[in-house]
Amino acid sequence: MHNYYKIVLIMVAFFAVIITFSNIQVEGAVCNLKRCQLSCRSLGLLGKCIGDKCECVKHGK
């Protein structure tokens, strides 16, 4: 039972870190990464923000 609490604590800490860092935005960044990824995914590509531009690239590059 003690290991169960350790696992739950680790999971809670992990999600807290993920949520915290996902809310941090770089000042002055114009490219919306989530929107970029979604639009490129519809083309079967991977969306990446390079500077203020969204670029669609093949997976594995």
Curated annotation (Swiss-Prot):
PROSITE patterns: SCORP_SHORT_TOXIN
Modified residues (Histidine amide): 59
Any one Pfam family match given in the protein's UniProt record, by short name: Toxin_2
Region: [R/K]XCQ motif, residue numbers: 34-37
InterPro entries: Scorpion_toxin-like_sf (IPR036574), Scorpion_toxinS_K_inh (IPR001947)
Comment field (misc): Toxicity experiments on mutants are done without C-terminal amidation.
Family statement: Belongs to the short scorpion toxin superfamily. Potassium channel inhibitor family. Alpha-KTx 05 subfamily.
Entry protein name: Potassium channel toxin alpha-KTx 5.3
